[in-house]
Amino acid sequence: MSMKQLETSMSSVSLQEKKPTRIKIALHPQSKSEQNETDRASKIPTGRISTTQPQTYYRPTNLTKTPASQVSRRSSYTTDPPSPLTGITGFRNYSLDDFEIGKALGKGKFGKVYLVKDKKTGFVSALKCMEKKELVEGNVEKQFRREVEIQSNLRHTNVLRLFGHFHDKDRVYLILEYVVHGELYKLLRNQKRFTESTASSYIYQMSEALLYLHGKNIIHRDIKPENILLHFNDTIKISDFGWSVHAPSNRRSTLCGTMDYLPPEIVQSRPYDKNVDVWSLGILMYEFLCGAPPFEEPGGAQATYRRIVKLDLRIPPYVSADAADLIKRMLTLDPAKRFKLKDMHKHPWIVRLRPTWKYKVPKTASHERSA
């Protein structure tokens, strides 16, 4: 795919240029709880940029149709009240010049993420910058497009927000929610493994995020510590939707994800459904408690593959009985018999440790809504 074809393919996710360096992007307002979280970021020292967010008070978003006479200067639908990110309704033209660029927050294969502040509103976010040339040469333009299409429509406490996106001649940019503590992977490497109290909080939150995604027929397919971010009060947010897929048919057969976390149906190239994420959550729980994935082998991918398909699972004796039970229920060879995420809040391991959590379960949690 050529550079021109990449730009054309991005048109469905609002990346068409109206002017040489400025394009229109859709911006999505934060929920009140999310705004409160980002307001607290002012306590974190970040060098050049203060992370104090502008004071904004607003009600839940309502969509209102724009009069035809105003279509030339406004979008077809606008938000009421104004978006806390833009300070204006509807769409806003953006270019890189609209941001103060702060420290680098992370680096990936195709670009970097920076702490940025909107010069007009003072709103702090994370800007993911990727070179178009590298996306094309890496043959990941479809993966990037998928990430934008999926993440633009997600609103959940435990899912990283994508506020908007734009591009210029050489790069594409994603305006993302700023999460103060960064990758959970780094914390796990520093601590070697988590306490059961901490791990149970994270696994519960992941189950809520996955329930939300599965309810929208989205399979993440790449659950791992590197794709989880840590915010205030032990709140985690799942990120990196490059391997995710919107799967209305509920059955797929594409090989993807990270080898240590892949379920047997994927490594054996069999059709799979949302239960692949349940398997990966079981792997994640094991790594949280033991410091490494359960089927990881020094012998390489083939050795790991053999252990996965044989379910060669060895749980250390220091893992509690109810934790081991949950791991085994998620790591079941038959996808249909794997643990149901909707029952996570009732599992004895979660019930026993929930009073010890720093994280406070919101009233919007799946089981709270159905109570």
From Swiss-Prot:
Reaction(s) catalysed by this chain's protein: L-seryl-[protein] + ATP = O-phospho-L-seryl-[protein] + ADP + H(+); L-threonyl-[protein] + ATP = O-phospho-L-threonyl-[protein] + ADP + H(+)
Molecular-function annotations in GO: ATP binding; protein serine kinase activity; protein serine/threonine kinase activity
Region (Disordered): 1-84
Keyword Protein transport assigned: no
Coiled coil: none
Record-annotated membrane-spanning stretches: none
Disulfide bonds: none
Protein kinase domain segment(s): 99-350
EC nos: 2.7.11.1
Amino acid composition bias (Polar residues), ranges on this chain: 1-15, 48-80
SUPFAM superfamilies: Protein kinase-like (PK-like)
Catalytic residues identified in the record: 222
Keyword NADP tagged: no
Residues bound to ATP: 105-113, 128
GO biological process: chromosome segregation; mitotic spindle organization; regulation of cytokinesis
Entry's localization field: Nucleus; Cytoplasm, Cytoskeleton, Spindle; Chromosome, Centromere, Kinetochore
Main enzyme class: transferase
Main localization, broad class: nucleus
Protein function: Component of the chromosomal passenger complex (CPC), a complex that acts as a key regulator of chromosome segregation and cytokinesis. Has a role in error-correction of aberrent kinetochore-microtubule attachments to ensure that sister kinetochores become bioriented and connect to opposite poles by promoting spindle assembly checkpoint signaling.
Homology family: Belongs to the protein kinase superfamily. Ser/Thr protein kinase family. Aurora subfamily.
Full protein name: Aurora kinase
Annotated source species: Yarrowia lipolytica (strain CLIB 122 / E 150) (Yeast)
